[in-house]
Amino acid sequence: MVRIVSKQPRKQRKARYNAPNHTRGRFLSAALSPELRGKYNSRRTRVVKGDTVKVLRGDFAGDEGVVDAVDMKACRLVVHGVMVTKADGTEVPRPVDPSNVQITKLNLKDKLREERLGGGA
């Protein structure tokens, strides 16, 4: 089956917005740290709850924290410690795009994920 892919930005945005859940995981991958990259012979992997990530871009660049939640609909991550203060003084989590983070420690509680990553044979 041939997939026709458009170059047009509006159609690219529409495809991301209307993507089914089983393909949204592709948008939720992030770069691995140099140490993990060498260990697993892989450059990127899907971010899951429990991974430790370092924010590379934006106001929170340099902050490191554990992923508290992964928002499949918005394709965003909620990282522990990345908070903004509202006008009334309450703090709320600031969602981060997966392309702006680097995975520094993997959550390997899922044996299938560990097997899929391999040990760098």
Swiss-Prot record:
InterPro entries: KOW, Rib_uL2_dom2, Ribosomal_uL24_CS, Ribosomal_uL24_euk/arc, Ribosomal_uL24_KOW, Translation_prot_SH3-like_sf
Signal peptide start and end residues: none
GO molecular function term, any single one: structural constituent of ribosome
Keywords: Ribonucleoprotein, Ribosomal protein, RNA-binding, rRNA-binding
GO BP, sorted A to Z: translation
CDD domains: KOW_RPL26
GO cellular component, one term: large ribosomal subunit
Region of interest called Disordered, as start-end residue ranges on this chain: 1-30
Disulfide bond is among the record's keywords: no
Family the entry assigns: Belongs to the universal ribosomal protein uL24 family.
Subunit structure: Part of the 50S ribosomal subunit.
NCBIfam families: rplX_A_E (TIGR01080)
PANTHER family: 60S RIBOSOMAL PROTEIN L26 FAMILY MEMBER (PTHR11143)
Function per UniProt: One of two assembly initiator proteins, it binds directly to the 5'-end of the 23S rRNA, where it nucleates assembly of the 50S subunit. Located at the polypeptide exit tunnel on the outside of the subunit.
Protein name as catalogued: Large ribosomal subunit protein uL24
